[in-house]
Amino acid sequence: MPNDLLKEYKNAWDKYDDKQLKEVFALGDRFKNFISNCKTERECVTELIKTAEKSGYRNIEDILAKGETLKEGDKVYANNRGKGLIMFLIGKEPLYTGFKILGAHIDSPRLDLKQNPLYEDTDLAMLETHYYGGIKKYQWVTLPLAIHGVIVKKDGTIVNVCVGEDDNDPVFGVSDILVHLASEQLEKKASKVIEGEDLNILIGSIPLKDGEEKQKVKHNIMKILNEKYDISEEDFVSAELEIVPAGKARDYGFDRSMVMGYGQDDRICAYTSFEAMLEMKNAKKTCITILVDKEEVGSIGATGMQSKFFENTVADIMSLCGDYDELKLRKALYNSEMLSSDVSAAFDPNYPNVMEKRNSAYLGKGIVFNKYTGSRGKSGCNDANPEYIAELRRILSKESVNWQTAELGKVDQGGGGTIAYILAEYGMQVIDCGVALLNMHAPWEISSKADIYETKNGYSAFLNN
C-alpha cells in the first residue's frame, strides 16, 4: 500500500539537524525575553515598534504629515492608541488584488485595578481588582504578583508603573484561607471557591507615625506612592494598572524543550507573526500583520478588532499608494487571505476526558489549524472554506512545515472564539492558526519550542506564497 494514503502528524523534533536545533532554541530564547519584558498591551506595542523601526518600518502619521507617497517595498506601521499595532509591507501587485494578513492579539487574562481601588482593613492596605478575561479565579491566589501599567494625571502627564519584576522590587498577592480552616471553602464548586470580589491585593501594613489620620496604613502607602510617582489617590481614576504574575518566562522540562510563561495566549502568536513579518524583504501581495487589544473580552472598544481602525488604516495606505476609492477598498479586503494567529488547546494526558484524541493538538507536532471554533453546534464560529485549507496544505508541504489540525475539545464540552469571524465579515478567506498550549488562561502557560519554530516558519511560508 502506498505510504501517502494514510495521514500521520509527525513530531517536529525528529526532523531537526544541529543547525535547525540551534534556530529552535534561539527563537525560544527571543520569545522568552519578549514575554518576560512585555506583560501588557502597551509594553508589547512599545517594544515591537522599537524593533520594527530598526528594521525600516516608519510611522504612517509621519508619512501623512509630510505628504509623502508609498511604493513597492515600503514598510509602514500604525499605532492604535499605544495598545494596538498594524504593520504593512507594500507589495508588487495592485492593492485591490488583496492582502496577505496575519492577525493576533496582545491582551491576556489578568486582574485590573478598579477606579477606586485603595482601602484599609484591620491595619492592612489593600487594592480592589476586577478580573479581565476568562480565568479560573482560584489560580490567582498565593502567587507573587506584579503591577504594570500607566497612571495619567490631570495635566496629561503619563506615569509608567512596573513594580514586582526586578529582584529588588517588592511583590504583591491575593491571600487564601489556611487549609486547617477551609472545610466550608473546600465544599464549594471550583468556580465559587474564590469569588471575584475576593481577589483583593495586599500591598502594605506599616501605619504612618505622624499625624492624626484614621487610615494610617493607607495613608502611608499613598505617601510612598506620592514620593515615587508624584500622584494622589484621585489619580487612580485615570489609571490603567494591570496585575500580572511576577517573574520571567523559563525553560520547562529537563530537555528545555518547552517554555513556561505568562501571557502566551496570544503573545506567542503575536511574536511569531511579528518575526515572520520582519523577515519579509519584498512581497508579491501587500503583507499586513495586525496586533490588537481586547480579544479576551470580545474584541470591542477603540483598540479591539471590531473598531474601524484597521479598515481606516488600510484606506490610508491605499490613498498613500495612489490607489484608493471605496470600491477598491472593498475589493482589496474581499480578495485577502488571513491567518487568525491564535493559540489552541494542547492535549493534556492528565485530563484526557475533555478532548477527542483524533481531533486534538499535540505539543511538538507543529502549527495548529482550527477549521472552526465556536461552541456546541459551531455557534459563533468562523468555518474556513476547504479550498483555502487545501491551498495552505500545499504551501506548508512545499516549505516542509509541520502542521496539525484540531478542535477545541470534545463536542458540547465548551468552546471559544477568536478575531477570525470579524475579518471574515469582509468576505476574505480566514482560518485560525497558531501554537498549542497547556494551561491556557492560567497564570503560567506552557508551549513547545518546536511548535513556536514551526509556527513562525508557517507564517513566513504563508506571507511568501
Curated annotation (Swiss-Prot):
GO molecular function, one term: zinc ion binding
InterPro entries per the UniProt record, alphabetical: M18_aminopeptidase_1, Peptidase_M18, Peptidase_M18_dom2
Cofactor(s) this protein requires: Zn(2+)
Signal peptide positions (record): none
Pfam family of the protein (one): Peptidase_M18
Origin superkingdom: Bacteria
Binding, Zn(2+): 105, 180, 441
An annotated GO cellular component: cytoplasm
EC numbers, comma separated: 3.4.11.-
UniProt record, GO biological process: proteolysis
EC class name: hydrolase
Keywords associated with the record: Aminopeptidase, Hydrolase, Metal-binding, Metalloprotease, Protease, Zinc
UniProt record similarity statement: Belongs to the peptidase M18 family.
PANTHER family from the UniProt entry: ASPARTYL AMINOPEPTIDASE, M18 FAMILY AMINOPEPTIDASE 1-RELATED
Name the UniProt record assigns to this protein: Probable M18 family aminopeptidase 1
Organism annotation: Clostridium acetobutylicum (strain ATCC 824 / DSM 792 / JCM 1419 / IAM 19013 / LMG 5710 / NBRC 13948 / NRRL B-527 / VKM B-1787 / 2291 / W)
